[in-house]
Amino acid sequence: MNLDFLFYPQSVAVIGASNKEGKIGNAIMKNLINFGFKGKIYPVNVKEEKILGIKAYKSVLEIPENVDVAVISIPGKFVPQTLEECGQKGVKGVVVISAGFKEAGNVELEEKLLEVARKWNIRIVGPNCLGVTNIENGFDCTFNPPERQARPEFGGIAFMSQSGAFGAAILDWAARHEVGMSKFISLGNMADLDESDFMEYLKDDKATRVITAYLEGVKDGRKFLEVARNATKKKPVVILKSGRTEAGAKAAASHTGSLAGSYTIYQAAFEQTGVLEARSMRQLFNYAKALTMQKPAKGDRVAIVTNGGGAGVMMSDGVLEVGLKMADLSEETKEKFAKAIVEGKLPAHMSYKNPIDIIGDAPSRRYEVAMRYALEDENVDVLAVIALFQSPALDEGIVEAVGRMQEYGKPVVFIAPGGAYPCLLYTSPSPRD
């Protein structure tokens, strides 16, 4: 599915544009102007001659040139007729910010909206949504002002949200935690385009490395299963699913009209399709940020290298608790460790079972030997490296040593528990293929 016309438009009409501070149509105009959108902006307002210094039109039909996308922010009862005019104009995509449809019990109005859209072959985002953002080209037709909601820098994470307010909080959080994003979609009621449509588009989007979502429910279960299964073959998909309890499901129904369904069914669907489920906002972006830096593991076998026995034990518990396996090191790898001990490269009283405990006086060069042996083992899919910097023996060379492990093409997770000292050494690596 190609939705480039929604994210890379050459022109946009803002229907309901306003000069009045505090109005949604005013905020949308300012965001399009201030965040660097290079296309043409056509404000539509029946009363004003100009909006923020730009010539205004009384109807989208009066605009003399082509319009790729229209953003509608007017009372809901007027939206179907306005959409009819968009169809006559040849508009390809419409973002309906307006509320008062299915989520408010007005099912017939939403059905009328969809009827008009199908008549003219228009694709709709919403209604009852915050808007969409393409951070790559500055196309931001959301309505939250930057002094209230920061915008993240361009990066590899796409995020779609069934809650506009939660989506805004995510964007703000991502900006303040330096998490780069490619695109943001507020799904709203999903009268037309739904989570599966956008997932299908994003799986082929070159700017997106990881697809993330906040979902209360899916529109079409069979469609979601098929699309998610195909999407996860190309790039990671991480979903924060709400409505997990009976109370949450009821709240979802009143929020967007979503049928949250049985949470156990969703869990099974995620497992079958390879979707990674997050349980909190922080977890969602921790997963996503990690997955933009390195490719997913090819298997579930984890090796641990540590300079602290207790930390290795706790990590072993964690590996099994999340459904992964502790790797069984091959005989060849064990022989490498034994030989290195004889040669004095590794201490005699270390353990080269998994976890690989290189003991508390380990410098970075000892870590490098152990990490290489583990990553060269075909039985190891993921390496977890625990570095307790409280030991004076551990030098800052460990940071560069861990970075060199990327040559093996396997995910490496670096854990440095404790205080501020590791933060002074750590610099975030650039995303790599």
Spans of model-derived segments:
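Catalytic-core regions of core metabolic enzymes
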Residues: 1-428, 432
